[in-house]
Amino acid sequence: MQYTRNTTMTKTDRDTLRSLHGRKKWEHIWAYYKLPIAIVLIVVYILGYAAYRHVTKKEDVLYLGLVNITAGSDLTEQLTTGFAEAQGLTKKQQVDLLSGLLFSESERAEEQYVYASEMKLLGAVSAQRLDVVLMDEYARDRLLADDYFLDLRTLDASFHALSGLNAGGTVLDISDAPFVRQAGFSGKVYLGVVQNAPHPERAAAYIHYLFQR
């Protein structure tokens, strides 16, 4: 037979409680009600955390990836926050940046890091967490060979007139875009939009933003 503890205070217990003061009184209350108190505290914590997450959670309106491209703090600011401000986005909306991806033809490159970068990029595409990719020439050739990019002209008819567009319309040379040119890259920088981009209209707006100045 199982017995459960009676957590209800008797008259004697209540009289004892009235006679106690300060720390001893709280210890007496805790002895009888520690389980209900613990449950209430856990519930309050869960509700508070959920409310905090709801208030502070950011909405990703564009996913941007950098492959074989290292952006300094100024360029990163222009590529992310600058676009958000130009679009008139709220403080809860942001450009999500996936940086540090390395595809290298150098034999000295760390194979594990390159492989991890490739898997990270593939995972982002599979999860539809990538829209726009900025890359160097080597990464461009690698990703073009794997048919990663859509025809940019399907996003906006005006893109037919872009001088840096390749023959297939899938990759755009953005080396002369103001932000990119000011960054002083040694080689050319290219842009592509992945086939299953979750925000194609925003990606088109991003291309306009890069060339607006």
Question: Can you annotate each of these PLM segments?
Answer:
Residues 1-27:
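N-terminal Lys/Arg-rich, disordered targeting/topogenic segments
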Residues 113-168:
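Extracytoplasmic "Venus flytrap"/periplasmic binding protein-like
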Residues 69-73, 138-142, 197-198:
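Solvent-exposed loop/turn segments at secondary-structure junctions
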Residues 60-70, 95-99:
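Short, well-ordered beta-strand elements
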Residues 34-53:
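Hydrophobic membrane-insertion alpha-helices, especially the h-region
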